[in-house]
Every structure is written in structure tokens, then in C-alpha cells.
């Protein structure tokens, strides 16, 4: 009897050789690697996708806020530099410089812009309208404008640092009449003189002063002669009858020590240039040299 051998194609699967099927879950999982891409996305993946899309603009917003903060800091620093070294606004609180500058305790005073650069390269000249820190002898009776409350005072100092609140010092505004080395004097027969020459002062207004210089040449008490020490200036208000200026601070009608009545040039903050407020008063603060003579 001849044995016959079945060909591989005719061999039937036996118990030891299970038939391979693509439907077998194990085989299918190994062969079709792309199945997850074809499957429908579940709720979690959709939520993650939406969250990612929602979060995309946030870095841009943070960047914008950061840029804004940097620009704000730069602006404050530049403004502080300007106030400290270039120019600063000041409020006129009294009538001592009328009619050139308006001011009173119950009205809207002029706000002026003070140039701080001019006197870094030069010195005050006769006729200049200057803002200066009062010398110690001029500060008698001065009261601090700061609050006694620590928190409020801190806020005031911070605002003063950037120029929104006046500094806590006795800042005054007057016109320069004489400078170091010059001799100023006032007599009823000669009026106000510097180095013996009468002054020409078109900025004086008799109606404002309620006095006529032709009748009352000194517009107050006689004084002098006073020789202004080097490095100092003699100042007076344009409203002579309502101004506590150099005349009010020198002893014995200014015939003794000249220092108390004069102002150190080092105390000069700057030169008044412009009236910036209110709009109806916009204009230039002019320097008029009174020593041109009549």
C-alpha cells in the first residue's frame, strides 16, 4: 500500500495548528496600527483640543501687558528725569508777582513751567523771574504742606516724586533786581536804584499795588545801600506793596548784614518761562532788565 503525502495546500488545520484569521483580535491589533486615527475622537480628546485652542491667545495677552508695564515704567522714569533736570511746573499761590503772575489763596493761580537747564550753563540775570528755595531766615512761619497721617504723607511724597504734588519746601517766585557785586538802594528822592542808576520797571502796575511809584518811589520803606555778596541775588516781587521779598528779610532797613536779605544762587531752582494754566493765561514769562535806565 503506497503512502500518499498531502500537499501543504491540501493539508487541513489540526488542533495544534489553529487557523489564522484577520479577525483575531490579537492579530488585528498588531497589524492595523493606523486604527486609532480612523477611530472617532472621544470626548476627552475633543475637550483637550478646545482647551488648547482657547489657551493659544494667552501668551500674546501676557506679552502685551508686559510691554505696557515696561512702557509705563519708562514713561515715569523719563518724566522724573524731566522734572529733576529739565523743567517742572509750579503753582503760584499768592499775589506777590501780580500782574505778571496771578495767584491767591481763593482763586485758580497761574501754573508756570520752570526751566531748570538755563542756570546749569549760566547764572540769573537782572529782570529774570526765578523760582528758588527760601533760605533758612526766610522760612520763619512756613508750615509743611504734608499730612500728619503717615499713609497720606507717603502718598503725597510719592506724587511729589513724579510732579503731581508740590515738594515739601518753601519755594518762592520773585524777580531778580540786582546780582553779586551790585549795590541796591531805595530813597524817596531817587527811588529804587542799582549802582546809583534809576530802574525802568514796566512790569509794575499802580492799580495792582494800590500805590503810585511816582508818589511813593520805594513803594514801602526806604532801605540800603546793600551791596549784594558774590554768588547771591537781590529779589523783589512785582506787586511791591504785597511782597515779602529781600526788603522784608534784611535787618535795620538793610543797612547791616546783607546776607539775610539776599538769596544764594545755589538755591535757585530755575527760570520761569511759560504760563501753562489756565488756558486763558497761556503765554511767555518775559525777562525785562530793569537796569536799562530811564
Curated annotation (Swiss-Prot):
CDD domains with a match to the protein in the record: S26_SPase_I
A cellular-component GO term for this protein: plasma membrane
Enzyme Commission designation: 3.4.21.89
Gene Ontology molecular function terms on file: serine-type endopeptidase activity
Composition-biased stretches (Basic and acidic residues): 47-59
Membrane-spanning parts: 67-87
Stretches for region Disordered: 1-59
Database matches in SUPFAM superfamilies: LexA/Signal peptidase (SSF51306)
Pfam families the UniProt entry points to: Peptidase_S26
Residues in compartment: Cytoplasmic: 1-66
Predominant cellular place of this UniProt entry's protein: membrane
Cellular localisation: Cell membrane
Regulation: Inhibited by 1-(2,5-dichlorophenyl)-3-(dimethylamino)propan-1-one (MD3).
Entry similarity comment: Belongs to the peptidase S26 family.
Miscellaneous field: Was identified as a high-confidence drug target.
The protein's name in its UniProt record: Signal peptidase I
